[in-house]
């Protein structure tokens, strides 16, 4: 009888690899004095936890671990709070399934 191995989401995400394009992030947050409610929501709903509030209460992004799932684009793209494009060819997330 095989033992059932339960794996956490974090363990599976750890298997992914990233090719970062230095100096060319594929996501940027529009400059703002006060973050919109949708930007604040991104700090909670981004599955890779790429969005954070800094010490000045500004939403910032660290896109190095981005899964390119598009959650942020759906939530904030139509309002112009973020600018989202696909990474250049050969860069971005490399999914490892299994």
Curated annotation (Swiss-Prot):
Pfam annotation, one family: Fer4_ETF_QO
Keyword tags: Electron transport, Iron, Iron-sulfur, Metal-binding, Nitrogen fixation, Plasmid, Transport
A biological process (GO) of this protein is: nitrogen fixation
What's an example of a GO molecular-function annotation for this chain? iron-sulfur cluster binding
Name the source's superkingdom. Bacteria
Q: Which InterPro entries match?
A: 4Fe4S_Fe_S_CS, ETF-QO/FixX_C, Fd_FixX
The record's family statement is: To ferredoxins from P.putida and C.tartarivorum, ferredoxin I from A.vinelandii, ferredoxin II from D.desulfuricans.
What does the UniProt function comment say about this protein?
Answer: Could be a 3Fe-4S cluster-containing protein.
The name under which this protein is listed is Ferredoxin-like protein
Which species expresses this protein natively? Rhizobium leguminosarum bv. trifolii
Q: What is the lineage of its organism?
A: Bacteria, Pseudomonadati, Pseudomonadota, Alphaproteobacteria, Hyphomicrobiales
